[in-house]
């Protein structure tokens, strides 16, 4: 889940291990996790604005060697000037100077700042002192001008050239020793002596020790990125030169010679810190589809002199989040209290005798859940304020250091860490602010499921896929509009207390169980109820009379049956008896 750093983003922090030769924040403890350095990765991501890429590939800024020169006090009577020069990897211009229309177009993008001086900076004899000072050159150079955009740089690009002022003969005014060499590392490794000779005086143009500050001006205009140079200069060691310019006479004419020698190189290392990383490998940028692909690339946080410029460097950062449609197997609920209340009511509404007691228990549960949420909110607020603890720790940690140089070094490291931490915490706070503005489903903590209904006709899956790749052109998901819709829906939910609907259902259930309501209903229909009662009483009386008649008939039948049974048993048993006896017997 990474996204490329583009030319429209603000400059990022790139740390160096030696601030004497390279300006910028210093940190010599990188990488933070050496065991994870160089992890393999395959990426296929999209972009909206042109990404920042360094290397020999379309869409990337090309590397080259650049020279910076300062003048020191002359120590020889035959020397016109004594120089110290620094050579290192930099950004290669496509065109040395913008001419005519291009030059006029660049003037409107000229940054604010003091112009570069007309004289070479004069420094001390100590070659270990190099003062960097930002200034704006008289003209800009083009670093890139193609389908990926136009990138220019207003930093000075010094070089030796012939001073033809006052010369009567033909004078080659063209640059003899350009500031940028095309052989890259060979000029830093093999060539340890440089000698320039001419019948014309040598001059150094663009007189200032200033770092490149590229910026995009087309198709959009973005901020300057002076931090990129710290990556290129660390890809190879810098070389320190010392020399002078002497004046001799040859063929009765003044003859000027510049001798520069080098015996000192300085290795460097530049690093980025989370959430930023460097993807190094065969990076391919496709402007038509606005995608970036890289197979079998390495994920690095530092660049040093072992870097091979056959590869390319892509700056990336971790994404804050993505928006994807999901399906749920249950209704969306904003809080666990509402879920608990709903589940309890399902089993309670059918058991009215325990309803009141259970309702009280549920309300107590709601209070407990609310209290827990309040405690969690206080804990979160305290965690956000922990930067004060970091600051206090940074101030008190000086007691552990033994030497003044170590104190300076570690203080600088702590300040850089604190600055990076503040930047990271700012991003996290913005993310938390957005999260708090959203109404999320309570049962998902790692991500937020909003109540926004996914409209497949408006945002089909191809648009979602492009959004996941990071592409945000006109054909992709308009994430800003979607966020606005979700925030509006969340605000509508925030107007109601969570669980209002469930509480309203509880109130309705209580009203239905209220006997007073029943009495009022009966009182409003008294006549109808009286008629119904009379009809019921008449039916009951009729049933009782029928029941009694049936009971009497049943008794007569039983007696007749009993008499018949007795007579049948005595049949033939009364012969020889008198008639009177027979009658008595029957009567009995």
Swiss-Prot record:
GO terms for molecular function: structural molecule activity. The gene is ERVK-7. This envelope protein is encoded by a human specific provirus. Has a type 1 genome. The HERV-K(HML-2) family contains type 1 and type 2 genomes depending on the absence or presence of 292 nucleotides at the 5'-end of the env gene resulting in Env proteins of distinct sizes. Despite their overall retroviral envelope structure HERV-K(HML-2) type 1 envelope proteins lack a predictable signal sequence. Subgenomic RNA transcripts coding for full-length envelope proteins have been detected for both type of genomes. The keyword Cell membrane applies. It comes from Homo sapiens. Keywords: Cell membrane, Cleavage on pair of basic residues, Disulfide bond, ERV, Membrane, Transmembrane, Transmembrane helix, Transposable element, Viral envelope protein, Virion. It is found in: Virion. It comes from the Eukaryota. This is Endogenous retrovirus group K member 7 Env polyprotein. The record marks 354-355 as: Cleavage. Pfam families: GP41 (PF00517), HERV-K_env_2 (PF13804). Residues 355-375 are annotated as: Fusion peptide. The chain crosses the membrane at residues 522-542. Specific enzymatic cleavages in vivo yield the mature SU and TM proteins.
């Amino acid at each position: 889940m990474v996204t490329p750093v583009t030319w429209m983003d603000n400059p990022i922090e790139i740390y160096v291990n030696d601030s004497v030769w390279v300006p910028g924040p210093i940190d010599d403890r990188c990488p933070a996790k050496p065991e994870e350095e160089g992890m393999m990765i395959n990426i296929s991501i999209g972009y909206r604005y042109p990404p920042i890429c360094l290397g020999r590939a379309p869409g990337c800024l090309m590397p080259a060697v650049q020279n910076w020169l300062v003048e020191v006090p002359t120590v020889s009577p035959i020397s016109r000037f004594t120089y110290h020069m620094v050579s290192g990897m930099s950004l290669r211009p496509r065109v040395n100077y913008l001419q005519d229309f291009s030059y006029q177009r660049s003037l409107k993008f000229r940054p604010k700042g003091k112009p570069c001086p007309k004289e070479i900076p004069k420094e001390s004899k100590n070659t270990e002192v190099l003062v960097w000072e930002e200034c704006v050159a008289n003209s800009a150079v083009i670093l890139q001008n193609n389908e990926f955009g136009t990138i220019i740089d207003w930093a000075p690009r010094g070089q030796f050239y012939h001073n033809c002022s006052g010369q009567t003969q033909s004078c080659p005014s063209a640059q003899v020793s350009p500031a940028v060499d095309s052989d890259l590392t060979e000029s830093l490794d093999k060539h340890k002596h440089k000698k320039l000779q001419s019948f014309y005086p040598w001059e150094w143009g663009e007189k200032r020790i200033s770092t490149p500050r590229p910026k995009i001006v087309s198709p959009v205009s973005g901020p300057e990125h002076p931090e990129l140079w710290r990556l290129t200069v660390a890809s190879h060691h810098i070389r320190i030169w010392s020399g002078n310019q002497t004046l001799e006479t040859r063929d009765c004419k003044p003859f000027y010679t510049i001798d520069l020698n080098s015996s000192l190189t300085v290795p460097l290392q530049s690093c980025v810190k989370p959430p930023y990383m460097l993807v190094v490998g065969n990076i391919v940028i496709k402007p038509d589809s606005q995608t970036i692909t890289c197979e079998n690339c390495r994920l690095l946080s530092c660049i040093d002199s072992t870097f091979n410029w056959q590869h390319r460097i892509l700056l990336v950062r971790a994404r804050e989040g993505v928006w994807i449609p999901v399906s749920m197997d249950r209704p969306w609920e904003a809080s666990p209290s509402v879920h608990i209340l709903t589940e309890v009511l399902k089993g309670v509404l059918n058991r009215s005798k325990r309803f009141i007691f259970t309702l009280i228990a549920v309300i107590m549960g709601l209070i407990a859940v609310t209290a827990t949420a309040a405690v969690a909110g206080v804990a979160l607020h305290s965690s956000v304020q922990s930067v004060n603890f970091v600051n206090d720790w940074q101030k008190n940690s000086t007691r552990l250091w033994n030497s003044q140089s170590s104190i300076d070094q570690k203080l600088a490291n702590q300040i850089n860490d604190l600055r990076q931490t503040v930047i990271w915490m700012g991003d996290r706070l913005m993310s938390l602010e957005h999260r708090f503005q959203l109404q999320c489903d309570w049962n998902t903590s790692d991500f937020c499921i909003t109540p926004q209904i996914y409209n497949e006709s408006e945002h089909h899956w191809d648009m979602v896929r492009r959004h996941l790749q990071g592409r945000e052109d006109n054909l992709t998901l308009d994430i800003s509009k979607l966020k606005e819709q979700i925030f509006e829906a969340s605000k509508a939910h925030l107007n109601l207390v969570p669980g209002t609907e469930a509480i309203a259902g509880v109130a309705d259930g209580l009203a239905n169980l209220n006997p007073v309501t029943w009495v009022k209903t009966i009182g409003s229909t008294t006549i109808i109820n009286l008629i119904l009662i009379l009809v019921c009483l008449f039916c009951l009386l009729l049933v009782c009379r029928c029941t009694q008649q049936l009971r009497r008939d049943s008794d007569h039948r039983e007696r007749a049956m009993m008499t018949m049974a007795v007579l049948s048993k005595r049949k033939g048993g009364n012969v020889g008896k008198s008639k009177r006896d027979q009658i008595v017997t029957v009567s009995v």
